[in-house]
């Protein structure tokens, strides 16, 4: 299922033995555009720490208006005893090695796919040891969804709007779309751009470049936050841009 980051922000986080806080934001890598960590706001519990939860530990998402919670398949003690990272420190590879080693999870940077040896999160523990061996590793540069909000979208013939939100797939934790607000050009219009269609990102300039014209983007299927993102809508969107759906690519990869 697809969720926006803004929808998930503030959701309660339920560990196996109790509440650990609420969703603050997400960190994603800029190679595969996949969420690597949920950042928890733990209030007075574990002050001064960045409490990071990998998608390996994320369970079901309850969207019920009276619940709005995400299950975490960890105990509070496991989280408390995990490698600590100060709230003002970046997430280094050294920290990630310690973090993933502590939980004995497969390292996502060991392999060619978004989750190492697979394009999805492998839940079979018996296969994990195999995943941590021998595959080519790569450096991940983690970005914040909070910091990425507001980045300007540059078409091949000028500016077109800014990033309003990120849309996440809770099965693979891939960022499927950037929600682009174009109200400065066409009042009330919001459109979706897939990270697969991005030419490059200038993190210093806070700009996302796409090899599409403003006119092409202008006439793309309109997205509204209230609209349920169905596969039919996604198919229409990909067909408009003459692109193959990611779900077909992943079907082949499996």
Residue ranges of predicted features:
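Peripheral interaction segments used for macromolecular assembly
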Residues: 1-254
